C-alpha cells in the first residue's frame, strides 16, 4: 500500500507541474518533454506496467482521458519559459519596509497608501511593508512627513524574478539517484514530501484530495463547503471516525482549519494540505494522531478562495481578493477576511472597490465567506456538530493572533485561555523548528494598540489599513459560533520573501503547523491527555539539518517574544496541565 501510495503521489505531482501555464501567454513553449524515466536502466517496454497504473489512476479516479493527460504532459511549466509576463506586470515593482515610530507617522503613511492605491503587504507595531512601482516612490515620499522619508529599507528589488521562482520547476520525479533529484529531500522518509516540494495548482489539489478520500476511506471524506462566485466547489477534507459508527448523544466536536482566503498566500494552502496529509497517513500508526481523529472531526479547507487562487496561477500571482464583480468593472473582488457579518466595517472601505481591503457593500457580500458561514451554521444546527476550534492560516509575518480583530477595546471573555494556548503553540514551534511566532490579539497584530492598557488610548503606532479588522472570520467564529479557541496564524516569513516564499519552505512550514495542530488537539482533549501513557512530544516533527534555513527577518524579535525565548527551559507541559478552561466544562 505504501509503495502504491508513493507512485500515485508522484503521478499527481508530475501532472501538476505542467498544468500551471499562465493562460493567454504569447510565448512559444519548448519542444515536448520526453516521458519521465523512472529507472534509467529500464527500456520503454519495461515501463508499461507503470503506464497502465498511471492510466488507471487518471481514468478511474480523476476522470481524465489518456489523450488529455498526454496533452498536459508535453506542455511547459511556467518556469521553463522566459518571464516576460511577470516582467510586463511587475518589472519595476519593489517592496519597501517603513519603520514606524509614532501614531502620526502611521496615519500619514495610511493616508498616502490610500491616495496612491498602494498594496500593503503586512503591518505590525514596528513596520509596514508596501509594494509599489519604483516610479511611484517619489510621489509616496512627497506625501509623507520628513521623518518617514528616510525611515524605510528595500526588502525586494527583483519582484518579477521572485514571482517566477514560486512556480513549479519541471523535474523528473524519480529516485534519489536520478537527474533532477533535490538533495534536500534525501533524508525524507515521507513519500508525500515529493508532492510538497512545489506549490500545486487547484487542478492538482482537487484530484489529490479525491485520491486521499479514496485510499483512506476509513477516516477521510471529501466534502465541499460551498460554491465560489465563478461556480467552483470549495473542497474540503473531513478527517475523523465515520459518523454513525457509534451512538453519540453529544455533538461531535469539530475543528476547522482554513487556508487560502487571500489568493496570493500560497503557503497557507500548501500548509493546510501538508497537515491534512500528515494526519491522514499517521492514523492507525500513531496513537497520538489516532486519538485526535477519534476525539474530533477535523475539516481542512485548503483554499476558501478557489477563483482567486486559480487567477494567481493563470494571470496575476499577487492577486488577493476573490473574483466577483463590483460597482467598478475594472476593480473586481472582495476581501474575504473583511466580508463576515460580525462587526463588519465596510462603511470605511466600501466606496473604494479598488482597495485590496474592500469589504463589499454589505455583510457577507463576499460569496465564499457567506458559503463557509452557511456550512458552519448548518453543521452546528442540523448535523450535531460543535465547532470547538478554528485555525485560519494566512501569510506572512509569523504571528499567532486571537480575538478580537475589530477592536482592542473589547476583551474576549476567554482571554486568559486564548493567551495560554497561543503561547503554548508558539512555544512548540520554537522548540521544534526554532522559529519565533509573535502571540497577540488580532487587533494589535494588524492595527496596533497599547497591549498593557486595552481600554486606554493607543500608545503605539496605529496603521488601520493592514491585515484584518472588522468583518473577520476569526471574530465571527469566536463570537457567533461560540468557538472557544479561534486563531489566525500568519505563517512564514518575516519579510525577506513575503508572499513569495520559496517552495523549499513548504515542508518546514508544514511541520510547524502540524506541531501546532497536535498541540492544539492535545490541549482541547484536556486533562485526559495527561492521564495516558502517550508520549505526545515524540510525535512532533522537527526540522532536519539539510532542510530550508530559518526564515530571515528584519530587525530583532519583539520584546514579548524575547521574554518567551528566555523561557525555553521551563517545563514544556505546564501550560497544559494547569489549564482549566470553560471548554472542558461544557
Curated annotation (Swiss-Prot):
InterPro entries the UniProt entry points to: M14A-like_propep, Peptidase_M14
UniProt GO MF annotations: zinc ion binding
CC per GO annotation:
extracellular region; vacuole
Q: Which residues form the signal peptide?
A: 1-20
Q: Which residues form the propeptide?
A: 21-170
Task: Name the UniProt key words of this record, in alphabetical order.
Answer: Cell wall biogenesis/degradation, Disulfide bond, Glycoprotein, Metal-binding, Secreted, Signal, Vacuole, Zinc
What is the annotated localization of this protein?
Vacuole; Secreted
The answer to whether the entry has keyword Protein biosynthesis is no
Carbohydrate-modified residues: 378
The annotated regions of Basic and acidic residues compositional bias extend over 577-586
What sequence ranges are listed for the domain Peptidase M14?
198-524
Family according to the record: Belongs to the peptidase M14 family.
In UniProt terms, what function does this protein have? Inactive carboxypeptidase that may play a role in cell wall organization and biogenesis.
Q: What is this protein called?
A: Inactive metallocarboxypeptidase ecm14
Instruction: Show the taxonomic lineage.
Output: Eukaryota, Fungi, Dikarya, Ascomycota, Pezizomycotina
The primary gene name is ecm14
